[in-house]
């Protein structure tokens, strides 16, 4: 029997009971039963599973491998190594990603400053490198002997020059600090709304609007490097279409699969840890009824700490729709 952690009453971190582990474990695929893999989680070693997956089976890959640092993933220890050794590790699986990806597909690979040189080098050996996204993590207290490590990178690459990318789906709604107007009093590039003054801006490769999952967020789990749903939503919306297949070879607690499901994509993922697989299955079940993504509403992404404005915008839209229905009925 697994001992449950004692948590504060308001802590919304997702956990598992022993009965839930038994139930969700029964839904997992194994390396020997991975043929029907669409919309499923495969529990096992990635290197055992990759040869059994068909070529050109996915449209988008999001890979968040163990970084080149010492880390404990629920007992699975990963040690830091030289840049050359880490590059060899990447070469052990990244070429297979090219085989699995469709000719019009894209791949995003996560890393930090230690792994930057190796990730870029090995990606360029196999794909067409398009960009590098840097996102602010906004977590941690820093150190006295060095600069606080406050960001991570995501490399964006494609199988060819013919790839999907929809920048209009990932616009960012920002508050207007200096509300300039043209001579007739017309707002210059911004809108006056009941919830404030906002401007829609094109996203850059520097993302400062992402919040790391924490105890008060229902998407939070005990996974040590869990990626935010908002981050995956940007990538999936920009680089895939409805019903496209999204693959995550290091699924962790399931964020990629959950967001793909919420956004109407198909998915599959591989994860070696039993506990994280079960958490991913539970999150997928909850995604049937909890379809919202924190920080994304009304078809746009919002800045951090704007939940009140988002809620007000939803109320305004709801009331406006109700008024329109009444007018139509009368």
Question: What positions do the PLM features span?
Answer:
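PRPP-dependent phosphoribosyltransferase catalytic core
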Residues: 278-330
């Amino acid at each position: 029997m697994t001992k449950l952690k004692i948590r504060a009453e308001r802590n919304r971190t997702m956990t598992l009971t022993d009965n839930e582990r038994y139930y969700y474990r029964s839904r997992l695929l194994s390396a020997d039963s991975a043929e029907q893999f669409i919309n499923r989680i495969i529990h096992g070693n990635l290197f055992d599973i990759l040869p059994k997956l068909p070529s050109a089976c996915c449209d988008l890959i999001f890979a968040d491998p163990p970084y080149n640092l010492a880390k404990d993933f629920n007992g699975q220890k990963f040690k830091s190594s030289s840049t050359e050794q880490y590059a060899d590790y990447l070469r052990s699986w990244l070429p297979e990603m090219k085989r699995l990806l469709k000719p019009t597909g894209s791949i995003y690979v996560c890393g930090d400053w230690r792994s930057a040189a190796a990730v870029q080098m090995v990606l360029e050996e196999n794909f067409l490198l398009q960009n590098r996204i840097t996102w602010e993590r906004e977590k941690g207290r820093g150190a006295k002997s060095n600069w606080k490590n406050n960001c991570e990178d995501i490399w964006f690459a494609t199988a060819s020059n013919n790839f999907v990318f929809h920048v209009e789906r990932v616009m960012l709604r920002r508050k207007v600090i200096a509300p300039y107007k043209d001579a007739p009093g017309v707002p210059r590039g911004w809108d006056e709304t009941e919830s404030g003054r906002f401007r829609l801006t094109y996203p850059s490769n520097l993302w400062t609007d992402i919040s790391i999952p924490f105890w008060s967020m229902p998407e939070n789990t005990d996974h040590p490097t869990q990626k935010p749903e908002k981050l995956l939503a940007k990538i999936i919306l920009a680089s895939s279409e409805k019903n496209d297949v999204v693959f995550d070879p290091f699924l962790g607690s399931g964020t990629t699969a959950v967001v793909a499901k919420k956004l109407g994509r198909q998915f599959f993922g591989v994860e070696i840890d039993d506990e994280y697989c079960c958490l991913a299955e539970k999150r997928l079940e909850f995604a049937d009824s909890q379809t919202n993504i924190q920080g994304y509403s009304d078809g746009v992404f919002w800045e951090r700490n704007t939940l009140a404005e988002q809620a007000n915008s939803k109320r305004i839209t709801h009331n406006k729709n109700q008024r329109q229905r009444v007018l139509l009925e009368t």
